[in-house]
Amino acid sequence: MQEQYNPQDIEQKVQKHWDDNKTFVVSEDPNKEKFYCLSMFPYPSGRLHMGHVRNYTIGDVVSRFQRLQGKNVMQPIGWDAFGLPAENAAVKNNTAPAPWTYENIEYMKNQLKLLGFGYDWNREFATCTPEYYRWEQEFFTKLYEKGLVYKKTSSVNWCPNDQTVLANEQVEDGCCWRCDTPVEQKEIPQWFIKITEYAQELLDDLDKLEGWPEMVKTMQRNWIGRSEGVELKFEVKGQQDLEVYTTRPDTLMGVTYVGIAAGHPLATLAAENNPELAAFIEECKNTKVAEAELATMEKKGMATGLTAIHPLNGREVPVYVANFVLMDYGTGAVMAVPAHDQRDFEFATKYGLDIIPVIKPADGSELDISEAAYTEKGVLFDSGEFDGLEFQAAFDAIAAKLEAEGKGTKTVNFRLRDWGVSRQRYWGAPIPMVTTEDGEVHPVPADQLPVILPEDVVMDGVTSPIKADKEWAKTTFNGEPALRETDTFDTFMESSWYYARYCSPQADDILDPEKANYWLPVDQYIGGIEHACMHLLYSRFFHKLLRDAGYVTSDEPFKQLLCQGMVLADAFYFENEKGGKEWVAPTDVAVERDGKGRIISAKDNEGRDVTHSGMIKMSKSKNNGIDPQEMVDKYGADTVRLFMMFASPADMTLEWQESGVEGANRFLKRVWKLVKEHAEKGAAEAVDTAALSGEQKALRRDVHKTIAKVTDDIARRQTFNTAIAAIMELMNKLAKAPQESAQDRAILDEALKAVVTMLYPITPHISYELWTALGESDIDNAAWPTFDEKALVEDEKTIVVQVNGKLRAKLTVAADATKEQVEELGLNDENVTKFTDGLTIRKVIYVPGKLLNIVAN
């Protein structure tokens, strides 16, 4: 065993051992309990960042812990390799996306190996290879044949600079989130998958996900957005009926206008002879916003000149085009009740429209709508036959009347929209559909799949190469000339089923059901909460599609979900001549701190004063990322892993502090030193519990308490940082423990073996080496230490004795000593009597097993 802890030598040696022995390569074993642990796979951007390291360290800790529990553990890795960044990089570097992507994969794979993650590399794949996306294409054609896929023209957010469609969430202040170009609206035909057919099941099955954070489930519930309401018809003079959806039919008698979306057919019709309205509609279409911003944006509208007839009281109300009505929610039209909806109230106030209250507070308090709408549920008035009814009774009665008159029906609505999977990009999986000369659309037959994306292309940064190359699109269908679809799949398609492909990556089908049903569902999934509503919802949907196609038997893909927090670091900037911020890397900044460790001044390496922007998320744009490679080279992978797991609870933000990394390194050096000193004295004998002294029993109790705590912290609570803190605390006690007698050494031997095994999931390289030094072999297949219940039983207890609240003595008593025995010992202790002589004992308070307080005066 080396004198000093040298991580570089150890880590290379141990990693070679894992590779040579295929330690983490697994197969199905029906005699063993399986555990499938998965971290969200990386996009091959070129280099790992600390966010990756945190995510994958958590996954590796869970995997190795479960392995020591004797389970058959699968931990795979692969590459989410399609996407726009590769196109942007290709244009910038004058190359094609494919070579850029494959080079990045090689580099990042090496980085992952240096960090010592226990992956089954035999299962590795990249989603940009035809061997992967071929099955996705075939599954898509099967969904088409089942009627779950359709094509329709839809208005999309179009970035003219990137030449691509953006999701609502990718539009920030009317501009593209990537390049800040003003976003336009464009009508284009797109492919959709009917996720709405599964909306109710996706909602209901959230209740089965007991191992998911409540916050993520709430986000998905809101995203799916189930509501119960009424779909009703307003007649429009000289036009077809206008259908609206409302969740508040109780307010129907307060309708004073109807709002329609700019994309509504009625709006288009009304604008035909109204240039002003046509211009307003165009403006609305080009300022599409994320739904989250609707509440705060300025409400704008314009009268169409059309009049709608109230379905129950026959009142005529104007029809307005309004910028807050969304075409893709409900029917694209809303009944407006300004007295009882804040958005309608603001609009009516702005345009001088009637505000008619019809709901008053149920508690009899006064109704006040002078400043804002009254939006609570209450009692109806000025509503004819429905006066006096409260919400549910009014809902049912008004819905029944509308149904009886053929003017409405009760209905359930979902906020969730069908999944638009078309992207006008090159670097994605081609959509396997063709159009023949008669305009008919057909899926590509299975024997002609995959439709291969050509990789040897020239990127001009504007048009997708497969759109520019007219020859690529030419094909045949049943001997007839046909044109290929030149859109590619949304990259969420690949990430929606990758977890399942890992179960049988070489299968000659999308999945091998036998293998998939052995491994699935994933027992532990780890990734960022930013994926709550897209990736995690699409994966749940895809799993149900796979189930209904007979590939899997489970309903849900991920049993337990851990969303790791972001990694933060200090960020510094100075203002340039134009007033813009120039961000300076923290490694190039010298700081001065006050007594509390707060930064009071900072200068960059050119001597310039820089401003400390605080601890913020590590990112390229803020130049505050720390390269994991540098840290591994400097301290070793185990130190980086230990810091990542210790510095913060896994689901909270982690503040990067190099002083903390140094502290983690010092701790590992202490463990190394103690094991080395112990091992050099030769083998220790077994613990003889009958021969232990009180002090030895107390130390052994600490060892087994620590084992119990660490086991619970990792397995149940997933508070890895507190588990590490408990191990550190135990190490402090072991370092001070006597090592004179044979039983002293026996306890230390048992304790060090427990410490090394408990550290193994977190710091596997040093643990491998120390395990060998302790005379054991093959820690990768060792058993997790079990705590001895008997060791936790105390023979004696220490009782603190206070006189008038001040500590005066400590008693060692038998664990089963009675209150009377403790009182007698306490009152007669010579140090206690010094402070009670001549006083009257007024009261004796005993807290069993802990404290004796004597009150005297």
UniProtKB/Swiss-Prot annotation:
Keywords: Aminoacyl-tRNA synthetase, ATP-binding, Cytoplasm, Ligase, Nucleotide-binding, Protein biosynthesis. PROSITE patterns: AA_TRNA_LIGASE_I. HAMAP family: Leu_tRNA_synth_B. It is an enzyme of class 6 (ligase). GO terms for biological process: leucyl-tRNA aminoacylation. ATP binds at residue 620. The keyword Protease does not apply. It comes from the Bacteria. Pfam families: Anticodon_1, tRNA-synt_1, tRNA-synt_1_2, tRNA-synt_1g. This is Leucine--tRNA ligase. InterPro entries: aa-tRNA-synth_I_CS, aa-tRNA-synth_Ia, Leu-tRNA-ligase, Leu_tRNA-synth_edit, M/V/L/I-tRNA-synth_anticd-bd, Methionyl/Leucyl_tRNA_Synth, Rossmann-like_a/b/a_fold, tRNAsynth_Ia_anticodon-bd. GO terms for molecular function: aminoacyl-tRNA deacylase activity; ATP binding; leucine-tRNA ligase activity. A motif ('KMSKS' region) lies at residues 617-621. It is found in: Cytoplasm. Gene3D superfamilies: 2.20.28.290, 3.10.20.590, HUPs, Isoleucyl-tRNA Synthetase, Domain 1, Valyl/Leucyl/Isoleucyl-tRNA synthetase, editing domain. Its EC number is 6.1.1.4. It catalyses: tRNA(Leu) + L-leucine + ATP = L-leucyl-tRNA(Leu) + AMP + diphosphate. Belongs to the class-I aminoacyl-tRNA synthetase family. GO terms for cellular component: cytosol. A motif ('HIGH' region) lies at residues 42-52. SUPFAM superfamilies: Anticodon-binding domain of a subclass of class I aminoacyl-tRNA synthetases, Nucleotidylyl transferase, ValRS/IleRS/LeuRS editing domain.
